[in-house]
Amino acid sequence: MAKKNVEETVECFKMSEKLKKDMIKKYGQIFRSGSDIIEENKNRIYIPISPAHDSNTGGGIKEGSFLGLSGMPGTGKTTTALQLIRNAQRPEFGSRKTFYGDIESRLDQRNIDGVSGLDGSQEMMTVFRPTEQAINAEDSLTVIEDTIRQNEKMIIVIDSVSTLISKSELEDEISGQNRSLLPKILKNFIRRNAIPVQAKGHIVVCIMHQMADMSMSRKTKTMDGGNGIQFQCDNILEIKYVTPWLDSENKRIGQFCNWEIIKSSGAGLTGAQYESALRYGYGIDDIHEIIGAAMELGIITKGGSWYKADFLPETGKEGKRQVQGQDKVASFLRDNPKIVDDIKVKLQEILLC
């Protein structure tokens, strides 16, 4: 009796294997072991944004994922996306090319020049933008979908999701009566392209404005684009507020963007808040941020106004490796870019270990 049960089990297993082969023939290699999935995820490359972002998101943004950048207009979302693009262009991250969906038609040379080291040439960065009239959301997303499916390992930016307008809204008379179809269109786009984005190793950046929600009894702000796109995004980073960055003469040289991790599917801690330093005409100030990140992870220690680290020059008779004041640390690092690169590597190793 036991032998018969074993034979039936073996026969059932054979049938399952035949069914599996038939399904693979029809749909492709859709069966993998759990260890294969783990190994595949382990080999994914993380693209850094900046030290402050990376130390809070678990090392940067993983290829094959969706990133949502949210906040009020003019708070630094586009600059942050361009910073990610600049880093992705570096050889150690695959010299990745960019498709920039400039739906708002606001990207200009000032934005490109405002991120130090960004290559805005057509070879590295293709910009899709309406010229004479608005292009409906369906057509815009079709162009982006074709780009996703026909290329590999690109940074693809939608700037912004909030500006997309459905075909019916674009062609009908202007009125406030019709409920926006955009969330449904975006949800469909996301569903169709979630797997191709992962398979092709892209990073899709969805820039979303905070919009006033007047349907509640009190004024609230909400991310535009609907729940579908928020559900799909692996990471959602939101700028809660900005504060001025003033120099010693009280002149504004930039702004501090105060971020919150709204969602993280990686090592980032949902709800974590941190500050990113955006310097006008330069982009995110890596030196300013790297000092903060290195202090958080113990690479730099501080006692009073003295900053101590193995890489700092020896001072005094005792030969202590320390300098007084953050400005002196920053000045030393700017004069020693090789040390900055070494610190970045060390930070990545700690964050991704």
Protein language model regions, located:
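Terminal-proximal interaction/regulatory segments of ATP-powered molecular machines
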Residues: 308-309, 315-353
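Charged, alpha-helix-enriched surfaces in structured cytosolic catalytic cores
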Residues: 14, 18, 48, 64, ...
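The Walker A/P-loop phosphate-binding site
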Residues: 3-122, 146
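Peripheral, non-AAA+ core regions of ATP-driven protein-machinery
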Residues: 2, 24, 28, 32, ...
